[in-house]
């Protein structure tokens, strides 16, 4: 569910802004409903649901929409979505993890496989790349919230494990179990985050220094992210600033 010189989760969206927002809310609602169905429909008693609700709030999703998504699960309404993770290699050999929630496994698998094959990638088997990532909590803030030292001190006091700061913003990493508590503590000091979610963090990064390769990689990620069933695309790529400037 954005590529720059410091690996980041990619959320390139095409089309009108309202269409992008609608698609984002749809994906957020789907995650909330699935999380509520898998556990208790109470964010305080369901860690995954807490993360999903926090992510929705960070994107300014209306409270009524959030509650409807939870009610859909507790009321037994809605489609039965299956959680699937796809793993593969993109242009330049970068590792990609694609998280999907689908009511039609065959449709989603076909779409994901086609996206990889048409954009210089290769869909792998389960576990083929995830061994190179850690499963963690991620809290994101825009650059304007403060300088690197300010955010680092706030994150340290909140109990975070690590911080990555760049011109694009601040990524604060936590264990999955402490994500909710750290997010609450940070909100008291820095304000509402722009993203709170479960994430895949690469243990090693792969540099893509060729402009054409980077462009094809972004096209692949855009294609995947535009699929309604795809929730999030994670990667271990790192794009040098000079290449990003050429790509605009």
Swiss-Prot record:
Record keywords? Cytoplasm, DNA-binding, Transcription, Transcription regulation
Q: Which InterPro entries match?
A: Integrase-like_N, TACO1_YebC-like_2nd/3rd_dom, TACO1_YebC_N, Transcrip_reg_TACO1-like, Transcrip_reg_TACO1-like_dom3, YebC-like
Q: Gene3D superfamilies recorded for this chain? A: 1.10.10.200, 3.30.70.980
Span list, region Disordered: 1-22
Q: Name one GO molecular function term.
A: DNA binding
Among the GO biological process terms of this entry, one is: regulation of DNA-templated transcription
Q: Which residues cross the membrane?
A: none
Highest taxon in the source lineage: Bacteria
Has UniProt tagged this entry with the keyword Transcription regulation? Answer: yes
Record-linked SUPFAM superfamilies: YebC-like (SSF75625)
One of the record's GO cellular component terms: cytosol
Q: In what ranges is there compositional bias, type Basic residues?
A: 1-14
**A Pfam family this chain is assigned to:** Transcrip_reg
Q: Where in the cell is it found?
A: Cytoplasm
Q: Which family does it belong to?
A: Belongs to the TACO1 family.
Q: What is the name of this protein?
A: Probable transcriptional regulatory protein Sala_0337
């Amino acid at each position: 569910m954005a590529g720059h010189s410091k690996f980041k989760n990619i959320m390139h969206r095409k089309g009108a802004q309202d269409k992008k927002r609608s698609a984002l809310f749809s994906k957020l609602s789907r995650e909330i409903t699935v999380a509520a169905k898998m556990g208790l429909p109470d964010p305080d008693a369901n860690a995954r649901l807490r993360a999903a609700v926090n992510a929705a709030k960070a994107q300014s999703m209306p409270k009524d929409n959030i509650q409807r998504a939870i009610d859909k699960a507790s009321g037994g309404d809605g489609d039965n979505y299956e959680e699937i993770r796809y793993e593969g290699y993109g242009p330049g050999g970068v590792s990609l993890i694609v998280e999907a929630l689908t009511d039609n496994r065959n449709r989603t698998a076909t779409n994901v496989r086609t996206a990889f094959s048409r954009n210089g990638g290769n869909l792998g088997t389960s576990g083929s790349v995830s061994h190179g990532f850690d499963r963690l909590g991620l809290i994101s803030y825009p650059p304007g919230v403060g300088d690197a030292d300010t955010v680092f001190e706030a994150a340290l006091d909140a109990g975070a494990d690590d911080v990555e700061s760049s011109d694009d913003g601040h990524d604060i990493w936590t264990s999955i179990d402490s994500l909710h508590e750290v997010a609450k503590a940070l909100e008291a000091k820095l304000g509402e985050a722009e993203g709170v979610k479960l994430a895949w963090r690469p243990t090693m990064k792969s540099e893509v220094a060729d402009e054409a390769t980077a462009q094809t990689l972004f096209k692949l990620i855009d294609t995947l992210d535009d699929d309604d069933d795809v929730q999030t695309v994670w990667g271990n790529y790192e794009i040098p600033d000079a290449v990003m400037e050429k790509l605009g």
